[in-house]
Structures are given as C-alpha cells and as structure tokens.
Amino acid sequence: MKWRRMPVGPIQANAYFLISDDQCLIFDPGGEGHKINQYIKEKGLTPLAILLTHAHFDHIGALDEVREKWDIPVYLHQNEKNWLADASLNGSGMLRGIEVTAKPADHLIEGDGELNIGPFHLETLFTPGHSPGSVSYYVKDADLVISGDVLFQGGIGRTDLIGGNQETLLTSIHEKLLTLPEHTLVLSGHGPETDVLTEQDQNPFLNGFSL
C-alpha cells in the first residue's frame, strides 16, 4: 500500500491518495480538481471513495468536481453534514467574493469505528477540537494516520473558528493520536508528514499537558 500527498488550492491544503494496486481512496480534495483528476488518470487508478477529515473550505474546494468525474461516494462526520452547503460554516464566507459549497455527503460517520472500502481497511477516530466533526483515519496496514488539521509537525490545529475548542483538541490528540504506535506516520492537512514519537517528544504545544 502506498500514499501520495498533493498540496492543492490557495492555502496549499494537502489532498492525499491511498493506493493499493490500481485502486485508491482520495482524502480532502481541497482545490485544483483538474490536477487531482489528471493524476488519477495518468496513474491508471480507480478511485473508490472520497473521505473528508473535516469540512473547512480549503479541504472541500474540489469535492464536487472530483466526485462527479468518478461517480464515487463521500464520507464526512455527521457533526458537519450541513457545512458543505453553508459558506458561513465552512469558512469560505470570510473570503471576498468566493463561496465554496458542495453537495451533501453520501455517508455520515458517527464516531470511532471501522470502514472497509474495497481493499482498504480504516479506523475512524473522532478527533474534534479544530472543528466539531474532525475525523482522523488510521490505516494500520500502512502504519499511518491522516489527521487533517488536528495535528501538524511541531504544531496543532487552530481553534478560533466555528466549533473549535482547544481543550477538546488537546484531549483528542492525546487520547486518539498519541496512543497510536510510535512509528505511525502522521499525514497532516498542511505541511510535511511527521510521526507519533516525534510529536510526543518535540511538539511544544503538547508539552506539559496531562489529562
């Protein structure tokens, strides 16, 4: 199993591809749908689904363009089911003259659980705090977790947007992400990948925090 990061859109949010043979899952198609679709075509991949870590505009900007091209379902946490169609909730309403909206998700995630999509087995980890419906996707077979804007290399997600809460975010990180095996790669919503051990030891936002 392989993965590929593709920074897209004006804020360079990371879209991800999880690839097994000629099939793939797409995570957070935040912009530049033509670029995402072209990569899929060039690699001869068959996408099976789109999984959203959360519904902020920079992670959903190309959602409809990609889903309609490949006719695939979209997964999102139920707490943000109304955000795709509401620019004031997904944050694009703050931008001048740009409102990002998308059609409703096909499948709503309720909390921690498991997803089996084709050859892919994922654990859904409910990790609110950056947003009320943030989900991290743990792929044990690939030793990685796609964390969205919850945890970054040397940083954590912002909590000053709608539904954000710093205490909730820190609890999510410590209870759901830092309890994963230390070698687990953390694929973040912006910037480079990191790993659980590095963030346990070096992340200044997590030092001194205790439950």
Swiss-Prot record:
Co-factor requirement: Zn(2+)
CDD domains: metallo-hydrolase-like_MBL-fold
Cofactor note: Binds 2 Zn(2+) ions per subunit.
Ribonucleoprotein in keyword set: no
Keyword Cell division: no
UniProt keywords, alphabetically: Hydrolase, Metal-binding, Zinc
Record-listed Zn(2+) 2 binding positions: 58-59, 149, 190
Stored InterPro entries: MBL_Glyoxalase_II, Metallo-B-lactamas, RibonucZ/Hydroxyglut_hydro
Family stated for the protein in its record: Belongs to the metallo-beta-lactamase superfamily. Glyoxalase II family.
Gene Ontology MF, one: metal ion binding
Catalytic class of the enzyme: hydrolase
Protein name: Probable metallo-hydrolase YqgX
Native organism: Bacillus subtilis (strain 168)
Entry EC number(s): 3.-.-.-
Residues the record lists as binding Zn(2+) 1: 54, 56, 130, 149
